[in-house]
Amino acid sequence: AGSKSRSRSRSRSRSKSPAKSASPKSAASPRASR
């Protein structure tokens, strides 16, 4: 569970960045995109 919690925290921080769209991880994660 700790690993998932960190992943969400990173996703949020990247979501604010405009590079999130260029990130392949964001596209693979539909939850982070939303």
UniProtKB/Swiss-Prot annotation:
Keyword DNA-binding: yes
Record carries keyword DNA-binding: yes
One CC-aspect GO term: nucleus
GO molecular function annotations of the record: DNA binding
Tissue: Sperm.
Entry keywords, A to Z: DNA-binding, Nucleus, Repeat
Main location group: nucleus
Residue ranges of the region described as Disordered: 1-34
Domain of life, per lineage: Eukaryota
Region of interest: 7 X 2 AA tandem repeats of S-[KR]: 3-16
Coiled-coil regions listed in the entry: none
Residue ranges, compositional bias (Basic residues): 1-17
Subcellular location: Nucleus
Chain intervals with Low complexity compositional bias: 18-34
Sequence repeat coordinates: 3-4, 5-6, 7-8, 9-10, 11-12, 13-14, 15-16
Name listed for the protein in its UniProt record: Sperm protein EM1
Organism field: Ensis minor (Razor shell)
